[in-house]
Amino acid sequence: MTTVLDPIRHRTILDDIDHICQTAGISQYFLANSMMDVCGPEEVEWVRHFPKNRAVSAGLVLTDGSNVSNRMMYMAGALIRNFTDARVFPINTVLRLAKTGELPTPTVMLIPNLYVKAGGSAKGLAHWDVQAIYDVLLERQAASKPTVLFIEDMDAVSQAYGNVFRDFLENNYKIVG
């Protein structure tokens, strides 16, 4: 693959690429390469039209688990190339940082494992952690800072996190398979 980073347009990114990638939670590979061959058309459209999409929804919920963490890293790379602060955080990191008041507030936060079935069960986070992540999502929505989430099964997330949580997602996020 040929890099999509332009040496002139992306000079500020290239000058600080190690720090930018470390902060974003992605490798340089995802920053330097296009998302086009890996991400689905709805994911590409969401990134391409980010300013418009940011104004009309709280973010994106991905339900197709195929290569989801890499897809999110490609999305973050594309957003960063367009000078948007995008960061990938596992759910446990989000919870740990939120509990200590140290959770960064990037323009776009991507969580590749908000809900993953554990051994086929519908058990998820402890109820206090569900409330903590719900708080994070509400605060990000109020600040117009979209969040991209992976949820393996919307029915199971309803059982594990409650109907109010699912209702919030369905009414405020674009859900794509």
Model-identified regions with their sequence ranges:
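AAA+/P-loop NTPase substrate/partner-engagement loops
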Residues: 78-118
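Loop/turn-to-beta-strand initiation segments
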Residues: 57-58, 84-85, 105-109, 142-150
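Structural motif
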Residues: 61-67, 90-93, 112-115, 151-154
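Conserved aromatic-histidine-acidic binding/catalytic patches
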Residues: 64-67, 89, 101-103, 124-125
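A short, basic N-terminal segment
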Residues: 1-53
